[in-house]
């Protein structure tokens, strides 16, 4: 940990003692800076441009060194707008990479790529900071034991379980419940694992970032009265930011998460929305730096950049960072280099279905499209694996029969198929669950369902023990005992009506 050289105020004396250079060229967000002989900054060093623009406004722009050009010149990428900068302006080499505040002071706050608060709630304690560029943990520090990361969400834990310290891709369009699922995961990791979360908004809409913040305050994930008791830190570098900021905001969020893992020894959830925008920003910067483009116009360093981010997201003997990354697939082309490079790093995929959301089944996780490398008998055990496979087979058969049902009706099916359909409909409804963060608008109390309870519930449905219960008894309940209680309640209500 070190004092943060980039967080100093424009007149701070600590910056005045550093090496000084001058701007010699400005091309959009890219600056060429000349330094005296023997005073060249290192790659990834933070440079600060200070001065006044043509109308006398104070300028304070932080840049990051990307290339050494020769002739005592460096090329740097700006982390904020370069409006008002001029050739000949003074540039200060801070002598260190960008550093951002870390630790408990970050919880409940919103930061930009430089680790500066942007939520108008006053300054943040930045005595403890950490550089955003680091090496991944050494092999000897890694925790190689494969273990399930229990989320308390039935459909995820049973059919596409998350790996502790793994990376999960979240696929889903607008309005299918991505934000609510993210908030529920943040809530559950705090309650069940004593962990915290870091949300990195990378190149997405500012409106969505604002909506997420407001919903987090409403649901209690961010505690307005006692900010330190919040469960999440937010880091935003949205669509309106220059490409340099969008390219580095993921690393800022990851650096905050690493501190919770390595120093506080906590389990951390790191959300990146959207990992594609990280690649897109890298592509823009690559073109501005004059590199030859690679396949489909992407940067030639695509795999290296993705690897340098993803390899830092892992489990160590101290704690874990489990990452959930929203993946935008351009033109639905899964072979596009950006999503294809991302897939190589993922351990599981959670696919949200518009069809299920339209039926009112939330979370709208598609049980057949969602996958996980953890769903193997040697990892999850034979019972879990067999129940998950039988659930998938039942739902798959129901899917195959839907066309016949639509044309001919249920009566034309065989006895066996009718039983399969009845159980599949119960399973489909039992995969729904009331969320803690959705209590505000559903009126139902949230439920955390342990993995053993989830397996027991689906085993009982598949074994036929609940063939006599109505399917609506399984909708929006926690464990199977709640479903039987709901069935009795429904029966009483129908008897009273008679």
Curated annotation (Swiss-Prot):
Residues that hold ATP according to the record: 172-179
GO BP annotation list: proton motive force-driven mitochondrial ATP synthesis
Catalytic activity, as annotated: ATP + H2O + 4 H(+)(in) = ADP + phosphate + 5 H(+)(out)
Keywords of this entry: ATP synthesis, ATP-binding, CF(1), Chloroplast, Hydrogen ion transport, Ion transport, Membrane, Nucleotide-binding, Plastid, Thylakoid, Translocase, Transport
EC number(s) recorded for this UniProt protein: 7.1.2.2
GO MF term (any one): proton-transporting ATP synthase activity, rotational mechanism
GO CC terms of this entry: chloroplast thylakoid membrane; mitochondrion; proton-transporting ATP synthase complex
Top-rank taxon: Eukaryota
Location in or out of the cell: Plastid, Chloroplast thylakoid membrane
Entries under Gene3D superfamilies matching the protein: 2.40.10.170, Bovine Mitochondrial F1-atpase, Atp Synthase Beta Chain, Chain D, domain 3 (1.10.1140.10), P-loop containing nucleotide triphosphate hydrolases (3.40.50.300)
Disulphide-bridged cysteine pairs: none
Membrane topology listed for this record: Peripheral membrane protein
InterPro entries for this protein: AAA+_ATPase, ATP-synt_VA_C, ATP_synth_F1_bsu, ATPase_a/bsu_AS, ATPase_alpha/beta_chains, ATPase_F1/V1/A1_a/bsu_N, ATPase_F1/V1/A1_a/bsu_N_sf, ATPase_F1/V1/A1_a/bsu_nucl-bd
Class of this enzyme: translocase
HAMAP family per the UniProt record, alphabetical: ATP_synth_beta_bact (MF_01347)
Record-stated family: Belongs to the ATPase alpha/beta chains family.
Entries under NCBIfam families matching the protein: atpD
Free-text function comment from the UniProt entry: Produces ATP from ADP in the presence of a proton gradient across the membrane. The catalytic sites are hosted primarily by the beta subunits.
Name listed for the protein in its UniProt record: ATP synthase subunit beta, chloroplastic
């Amino acid at each position: 940990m070190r004092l943060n050289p980039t967080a100093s105020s424009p007149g701070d004396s600590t910056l005045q003692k550093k090496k000084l250079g001058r701007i010699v060229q400005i091309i959009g967000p890219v600056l060429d800076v000349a330094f005296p002989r023997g005073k060249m900054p290192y790659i990834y060093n933070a440079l600060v441009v200070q001065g006044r623009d043509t109308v006398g406004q104070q300028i304070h722009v932080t840049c990051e060194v990307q290339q050494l050009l020769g002739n005592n010149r460096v090329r740097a990428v700006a982390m904020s707008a370069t409006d008002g900068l001029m050739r000949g302006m003074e540039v200060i080499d801070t002598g260190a990479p960008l550093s951002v505040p870390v630790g408990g002071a970050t919880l409940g706050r919103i930061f930009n790529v430089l680790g500066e608060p942007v939520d108008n709630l006053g300054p943040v304690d930045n005595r403890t900071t950490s550089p955003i560029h680091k090496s991944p943990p050494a092999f000897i520090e890694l925790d190689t034991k494969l273990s399930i990361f229990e989320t308390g969400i039935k459909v995820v834990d049973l059919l596409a379980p998350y790996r502790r310290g793994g990376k999960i891709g979240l696929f889903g369009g607008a309005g299918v419940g991505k934000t609510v699922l993210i908030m529920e995961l943040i809530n559950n990791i705090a309650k069940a694992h004593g962990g915290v979360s870091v949300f990195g908004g990378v190149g997405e809409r500012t409106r969505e970032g604002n909506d997420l913040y407001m919903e987090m305050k409403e649901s209690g994930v961010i505690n307005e009265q006692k900010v330190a008791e919040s469960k999440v830190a937010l880091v935003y570098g949205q669509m309106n930011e220059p490409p340099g900021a969008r390219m580095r905001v993921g690393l800022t969020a990851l650096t905050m998460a690493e501190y919770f893992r390595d120093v506080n020894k906590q389990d951390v959830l790191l959300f990146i929305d959207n990992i594609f925008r990280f690649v897109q920003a890298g592509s823009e910067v690559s073109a501005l730096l004059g590199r030859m483009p690679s396949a489909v116009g992407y940067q030639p360093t695509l795999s290296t950049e993705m690897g340098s981010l993803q390899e830092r997201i892992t489990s160590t003997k101290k704690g874990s960072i489990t990452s959930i990354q929203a993946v935008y697939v351009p033109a639905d082309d899964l072979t596009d280099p950006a999503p294809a490079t991302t897939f190589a790093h993922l351990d599981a995929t959670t696919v949200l279905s518009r069809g299920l959301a339209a039926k009112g089944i939330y979370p709208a996780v598609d049980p057949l499209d969602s996958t996980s490398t953890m769903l193997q008998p040697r990892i999850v055990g034979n019972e879990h694996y067999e129940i998950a496979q039988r659930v998938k087979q039942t739902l798959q058969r129901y899917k195959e029969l839907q066309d016949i049902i639509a044309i001919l009706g249920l009566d034309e099916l065989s006895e066996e198929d009718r039983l399969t359909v009845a159980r599949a409909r119960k399973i489909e409804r039992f995969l729904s669950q009331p969320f803690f963060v959705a209590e505000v608008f559903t009126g139902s109390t949230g439920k955390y369902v342990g993995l053993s309870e989830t397996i027991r519930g689906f085993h009982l449905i598949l074994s036929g023990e609940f063939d006599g219960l109505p399917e609506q008894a399984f909708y929006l309940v926690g464990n199977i005992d709640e479903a039987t209680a709901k069935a009795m309640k429904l029966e009483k209500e129908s008897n009273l009506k008679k």
